[in-house]
Amino acid sequence: MSERRRSAVALSSRAHAFSVEALIGSNKKRKLRDWEEKGLDLSMEALSPAGPLGDTDDPATHGLEPHPDSEQSTGSDSEVLTERTSCSFSTHTDLASGAAGPVPAAMSSMEEIQVELQCADLWKRFHDIGTEMIITKAGRRMFPAMRVKITGLDPHQQYYIAMDIVPVDNKRYRYVYHSSKWMVAGNADSPVPPRVYIHPDSLASGDTWMRQVVSFDKLKLTNNELDDQGHIILHSMHKYQPRVHVIRKDFSSDLSPTKPVPVGDGVKTFNFPETVFTTVTAYQNQQITRLKIDRNPFAKGFRDSGRNRTGLEAIMETYAFWRPPVRTLTFEDFTTMQKQQGGSTGTSPTTSSTGTPSPSASSHLLSPSCSPPTFHLAPNTFNVGCRESQLCNLNLSDYPPCARSNMAALQSYPGLSDSGYNRLQSGTASATQPSETFMPQRTPSLISGIPTPPSLPSNSKMEAYGGQLGSFPTSQFQYVMQAGNAASSSSSPHMFGGSHMQQSSYNAFSLHNPYNLYGYNFPTSPRLAASPEKLSASQSTLLCSSPSNGAFGERQYLPTGMEHSMHMISPSTNNQQATNTCDGRQYGAVPGSASQMSVHMV
């Protein structure tokens, strides 16, 4: 027996390979090896996006193959298991390289993002001069505002768009007026708390951002370091650079309006050199001021032409009593209106092509509240021609109800009835040649009368007209246009003086409301003769103005109260200077050169 056992033990290597013990042991090792390979295949399929590793030629898979000499090894089962399950990847990053495949694609998408500045030409114009931005305690918006167009975003990815403003350098500046340049004035002030303006449309998809112009027009700049409104805090007289940030959603965890913009692979920042600006509390460069007024649609109030007027014209615009309250129409105005109406064939710009008066055409001469005039004197009253007869011959049917009621009220006065005008016309001399009609614009309101003047000389053409005014109560005498000739320069220049009947030009009157009487005279060859002004202490405050061009004289009475009576309209003789006249100066006309005008009562 012992010999047999020794013989079995002493079997050769070839015989041992075919023994029962060897066959049973090799089957167990083969099954264990197959199970290990299947488990590794399943785990690698889950890690690799390209499919099963068996379909690829990745050399790493060769590390899973058993060693060629493994079948001949006689190691233990634990050694075989350790050898077969060990991963051939050298590091953890190599193992995760297959799973991190999309990361390079995301990084490449961030690199493809482009931001284009809108209104770049306007920014360049400001930059060439030296852009300035106003900052206030309450906050001031930027002009030009930052507007950008973004391209290259992933349409399905979510992004934040933000903006911040950072200092260009650590210097403080001052503006030198004689050279119109910004110069360094010292070191910058202490840093301000960081502020980030997150666009109100955030968070949005890349497709949404790319379909619109991203505007930061609601961003405000302030110098209040304690601001709690979310405005960007800046120091005055410092240079700053706006920046636009595109932040992917997965990198926005640290994004906050009161913290600096996070830095990482999912954040891309853009800036534009032409958007550098200097903060100020008031514009230093006048060129910047003018450019902002011209280009900023919200600065239209500063584009008023009156702001640019200087000298006497600005003073006259400021104080209305330096000039007449309204402008007298001239022949150029009628010509312009006629051209605007398409070259009407009538004799007047207020006449239609058939020669019929058009109240609507003359409505621009009157108040918008009641366009047609309240009342007109008939043509040739006081023997004054009215070539523009349509201005004098408007019928009652041509007026709106508001004008008709006023006309009826006017006609109720006996002094303004048709018979009164007939008497005025009958007392005048023969008709003279017609002249041009001038119609000033006045503001109509309630009509009242004027005080009754004293009796006038019998030869006065104004006697009848003065008599018609007796039915009106006391009011103010606002405008008086007076005229005289060289022969009567020493006589009373008063409008009711008898010497006016020998003058070569006539006074015509227009009764306006409130409580106004207007007289106009247009001498052909005016000249100015100065004499002292005489006023009575008990009478109304008087202001007389004479245009320097001498076209006509204007006298304006500004009463201190309605209780003042108009005794200044007193009779005077031809050889006595009136003591209650507006002004001793008068406009004379060369004898024989008559200039007339019609009467327009409103």
From Swiss-Prot:
Biased composition regions of type Low complexity, renumbered to the chain: 346-369
Consequences of knocking out this gene: Mice show a general reduction of bone size and changes of bone shape. In the forelimb skeleton, the scapula lacks the central region of the blade. Cartilaginous templates are already reduced in size and show a transient delay in ossification in mutant embryos. Mice show a significantly reduced proliferation of prehypertrophic chondrocytes as well as of mesenchymal precursor cells.
Keyword Cell wall biogenesis/degradation: no
Positions of post-translational Phosphothreonine modification: T330
Compositionally biased intervals (Polar residues): 71-94
Disulfide bonds: none
Localization terms from the record: Nucleus
Ranges annotated as DNA-binding: 122-304
Disordered: region residues: 43-95, 338-369, 425-444
CDD domains, sorted: T-box_TBX15-like
Pfam family for this entry, one: T-box
GO biological process, alphabetically ordered: embryonic cranial skeleton morphogenesis; embryonic skeletal system morphogenesis; negative regulation of transcription by RNA polymerase II; positive regulation of DNA-templated transcription
Any GO CC annotation of this UniProt entry: nucleus
Principal subcellular localization: nucleus
Keywords: DNA-binding, Nucleus, Phosphoprotein, Transcription, Transcription regulation
Oligomer and partners: Can form a heterodimer with TBX18.
Name of this protein: T-box transcription factor TBX15
